[in-house]
Structure formats: structure tokens, C-alpha cells
Amino acid sequence: MNKRTYAGISEQYAKIDTSKIVLIPVPYDGTSTWQKGADKGPEAFLNASENMELYDIETDSEVYKNGIYLSEAVTENSSPEKMVAAVHAVTKTFIRKNKFVTIFGGEHSVSIGTIRAFNECFNDLTVVQIDAHADLRKEYNGSSCNHACTAYEASQNTNLVQVGIRSMDILEKSVMDPDKIFFAHEMAIDDYWMENAIDLMGKNVFITFDLDAFDPSLMPSTGTPEPGGLLWYETLDFLKKIFKEKNVVGFDIMELCPNEKDKSSDFLAAKLYYKMLSYKFDNTEEADYGNESGFKEPNNKISKFEDEEYD
């Protein structure tokens, strides 16, 4: 991945010392089981971002002026477990620098590392998983760090709220919390699903967004597309409500599997990322991601996992 700034913004808004936002690319596709190519997702996303207008009409803002630092990509791919450990370490390093940390993958197994880092750094974390798949397997193909296992650890260690689910294995029913999972077919006839989902969330929220949550008519370029998904404006409405009512401490976007002949999905992913930032900073009077936002002091929290520093 060539060294560049996010969306081609000037260096003035891209320095680590002055940027409030950090973007970590993770071009990993080691455990996907159908369409390959999610490792090309971050590059396609960044290319699309460079061709996007940076003024957001809805919020009347230019969120990039808060500073967006594009970090070096996490390229560890020797094993799923080592990739997760590397993502965990890099994410945690930037959280401790008091940045609003965002991650773009890559297949959804990447989120095991990001969720682990945020859970160690923020009190009473709610993980909002927007996804077509439940991803609640404890292990798949010999690894607990498979993309089919993305939400298992979160289901055990955080307040997990799942939205848009329309594909799962019957064994995952024994793991899921039926009161905190919103199936797509039920959402389609429930005018209050957004409010009901938000009522289940605590103060501190991390959003993990698998792009296959969208209907494939809107987002065909993903590893495992499923019919019956979310549409653009209902998704934005839901996200806007979360950012307004909760303290979103970070987010990731996963599973862009770019198609050389159709760039529309790349552009949608780029717009989604920028929209989420615009909502976050539209609702933040003074950006403080430290103790007042539920941040755990590093010396008060013993890591539950092997801790590596990636500076």
C-alpha cells in the first residue's frame, strides 16, 4: 500500500500529533471461505476516498479538519491468531494516545482484535454488530480467529447487540442472546427496531460494521452477500441515532471485496466511513476520549491477552 494521506487531505490535517482521528488499514483475507479479495478492500476504499467531496451536506461540516491520521497498514498474515494480536496491539496503542480510532479491513476476523482492544480500554462496552451473519461460532476451520467467529468473544465479554442478521448456523442459537439480536426479516415489519436496539446499548459503544449488512443490490462487492439487507438511508438513520444518543468510542468497517469493473461499492464504503465520522464529530462539542468518556486508565487494567506495543 503506497504511503499517502486519507482522502488526499493536506499534511496539515494528517499529522499524528494534531489529528483527533486515526485510521488503521488492515488488508487481511486469510480465513474467508467464499469470495476472496477483502485484502484489497483498504486500498480500494482509500482510492475511492480520494475522489469524494469532503463537505458533508447533512451535517454542514468538513470533518477531516479535525485531523485524520492514516497509520501504517497492519500486514501481519502468518496466522489468524498473529493477525488478531497485531491488530489488538496497534489499536490499543492509538487508543492510549487519546485518539478516536477507526479500522478498515479486511475480512471480519480483523474485528476480533479491535473489539478486544476497545473492551480493555473502555468501561461497560457495548458492541453493536451490523452484519448479515451472526458470526457466533466459537471455532471454525480449526481457529477461534476465523471470520465466522468474529462476535463470539464479544458475546462472552461485552454487551453485544446484533443488527441485520439473516444467516447463521443452528448451533449459534445456543450462543446468541435472543433479546439482543435483530433479525432482518423481523426488522422489515417493526417500525421501532432502531429505538429498541438503542435501548439495549450502554453508554460506551463500539460499532463493527460488516458491509454485507447492506442489501447486495446496494453493496454487491463483499465476500458473502446475502439478500434482504439494509438500505442506505435507513442505515444512516440508525447510525445517526446511535452517535447522537451514545458515546461511540470507535468503529470498524469490514469485508469490502472490490470489483475492478464496478467501483460503486468502493465509493459506498468511502461515504459510509466519512458519514460515520461526520455524525461522531457533529455530536462532540469537545473531543475528549479519555476518562470522561469511560476510558480505563492503562495502569488500572491488566490485559486479559498478550500485550504487544506497535509504535
What residue ranges belong to the model's regions?
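Conserved alpha-helical scaffold segments that buttress catalytic/binding sites
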Residues: 2-311
